């Protein structure tokens, strides 16, 4: 099971606080040695100010005395920061200022000019607000951090060196509070900033897009139609697809699940996804991607069925949609099998799908009606499923060939880009410690 776990591979792309839920998720699943995992969990917590959580990892009576001392120091520091930030919050919570921040017509610069001129707000006071928000976040007080960061990002200009960190911090706070509607809004704002604020180097742009896609997993797998948005962002936006291929091919697991389980994107996206999976097979392969490879490239149905069974329930992000994936995978196996054989007995299909014959026939009828599978008919007398021949128009052939040529051109451009960035991409994977909210 450990060979399919992506926690270690993905951790460098997350903030420490976002890694903690992943560790808590895998602890009871016996994927790794329990004692070793507890020590890792403790080391992660020690890099935060969540001292009470650290203490809980020790057996009763074995808590180091220095932790109690550190707890006292943290409480003292929080009070000192609070004294400095209280006047700032009082200004920002005044009715005129709140009305200005709620207005979509005023820029951050205009609001800052007003507050500076009329309330004496200084740059030092704003820095105090940011430090207090970050401190509350490190203590695990995500509600307080979210509130302060919301004030901060609504008043400082985007050129401020802490602005991007505030966007990340606000998103992380909402994720950890499981406020998915707010998190979705924050994710959109962060993506807009990354997409429309070119960074100094292409390497930095790749870093930012890689972080964004990893953090987005928390939101998209907990938000209605989030899987469709994964397909739109990860597969249909070339800069993000390039980033996956250059820096984080393991995200193909989540893209594959999103495509397979999507009710609206699956049909149009499967071909493009399979091409990418085939190209990246030497960089990343997992039960999910291998299932599609077996089904659409090798045409190995027995192996494909085994791969479906191997899809793990031990993935933090995929547990909620695992049954959807299995059901959709069963449909893909059925459709592909019938398209190749054109005529097949329901009894054989039932065996393939691990179902009783009557149950399988009912299931197939429902599938044909629900998904409108082209040309599929059931001959109940003969106990067969018959797939009618589908003719492809000249227009469809031209469109498909054009798409194929476009895809190949994009892949050639990507390979050239890879040659330039391969020597530098290790920086991304080793970029574990940082001074802002992305500090893992």
From Swiss-Prot:
SUPFAM superfamilies in the record: Winged helix' DNA-binding domain (SSF46785)
SMART domains reported for this sequence: eIF3_N, PINT
Domain PCI, first and last residues per copy: 219-392
PROSITE patterns xref list: PCI
Protein biosynthesis keyword on record: yes
Entry GO MF terms: translation initiation factor activity
Cited Pfam families: eIF3_N (PF09440), PCI (PF01399)
Highest taxon of the lineage: Eukaryota
GO CC terms of this entry: eukaryotic 43S preinitiation complex; eukaryotic 48S preinitiation complex; eukaryotic translation initiation factor 3 complex, eIF3e
CDD domains: eIF3E
Keyword Protein biosynthesis included in the entry's annotation: yes
One BP term from GO: formation of cytoplasmic translation initiation complex
Keywords, comma-separated and alphabetical: Cytoplasm, Initiation factor, Protein biosynthesis
Primary localization: cytoplasm
Annotated localization: Cytoplasm
Classification via HAMAP family: eIF3e
Job description of the protein: Component of the eukaryotic translation initiation factor 3 (eIF-3) complex, which is involved in protein synthesis of a specialized repertoire of mRNAs and, together with other initiation factors, stimulates binding of mRNA and methionyl-tRNAi to the 40S ribosome. The eIF-3 complex specifically targets and initiates translation of a subset of mRNAs involved in cell proliferation.
Assembly and binders: Component of the eukaryotic translation initiation factor 3 (eIF-3) complex.
Family from the record: Belongs to the eIF-3 subunit E family.
Protein name according to UniProt: Eukaryotic translation initiation factor 3 subunit E
Organismal lineage: Eukaryota, Metazoa, Ecdysozoa, Nematoda, Chromadorea
């Amino acid at each position: 099971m450990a060979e399919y776990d992506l926690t270690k591979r993905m951790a460098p792309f997350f903030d420490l606080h976002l890694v903690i839920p992943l560790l808590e998720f895998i602890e009871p699943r016996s994927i790794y040695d329990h004692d070793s995992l507890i020590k890792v969990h403790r080391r992660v917590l020690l890099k935060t100010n969540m001292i009470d959580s650290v203490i809980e990892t020790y057996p009763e009576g074995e808590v180091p005395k220095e932790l109690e001392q550190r707890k006292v120091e943290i409480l003292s520091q929080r009070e000192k920061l609070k004294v400095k930030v209280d006047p700032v919050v009082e200004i920002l919570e005044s009715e005129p200022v709140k009305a200005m921040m709620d207005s979509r017509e005023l820029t951050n610069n205009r609001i800052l000019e007003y507050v500076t001129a009329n309330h004496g707000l200084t740059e030092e006071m704003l820095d105090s607000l940011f430090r207090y928000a970050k401190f509350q976040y490190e203590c695990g007080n995500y509600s307080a951090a979210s509130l302060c960061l919301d004030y901060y990002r609504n008043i400082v200009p985007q050129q401020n060196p802490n602005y991007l960190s505030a966007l990340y911090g606000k998103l992380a706070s909402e994720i950890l509070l499981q406020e998915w509607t707010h998190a979705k809004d924050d994710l959109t704002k962060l993506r807009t900033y990354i997409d429309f604020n070119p960074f100094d180097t292409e390497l930095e742009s790749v870093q930012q897009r890689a972080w964004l896609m990893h953090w987005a997993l928390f939101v998209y797998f907990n938000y209605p139609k989030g899987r469709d948005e994964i397909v739109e962002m990860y597969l249909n936006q070339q800069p993000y697809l390039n980033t996956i291929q250059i820096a984080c091919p393991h995200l193909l697991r989540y893209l594959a699940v999103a495509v397979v389980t999507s009710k609206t994107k699956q049909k149009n996206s499967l071909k493009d996804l399979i091409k990418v999976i085939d190209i990246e097979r030497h960089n990343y392969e997992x039960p999910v991607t291998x299932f599609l490879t077996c089904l659409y490239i090798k045409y190995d149905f027995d192996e494909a069925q085994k791969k479906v069974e191997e899809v793990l329930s031990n993935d933090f992000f995929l547990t909620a949609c695992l049954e959807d994936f299995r059901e959709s995978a069963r449909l893909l196996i059925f459709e592909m099998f019938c398209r190749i054989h054109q005529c097949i007995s329901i009894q054989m299909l039932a065996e393939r799908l691990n179902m009783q014959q009557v149950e399988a026939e009912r299931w197939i009828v429902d599938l044909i009606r629900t998904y409108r599978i082209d040309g599929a008919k059931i001959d109940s007398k003969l106990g067969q499923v018959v797939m009618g021949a589908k003719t492809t128009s000249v227009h469809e052939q031209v469109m498909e060939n054009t798409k194929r040529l476009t895809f190949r051109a994009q892949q050639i451009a990507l390979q050239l880009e890879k040659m330039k960035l391969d020597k530098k991409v290790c920086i991304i994977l080793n970029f574990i410690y940082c001074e802002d909210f992305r500090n893992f």
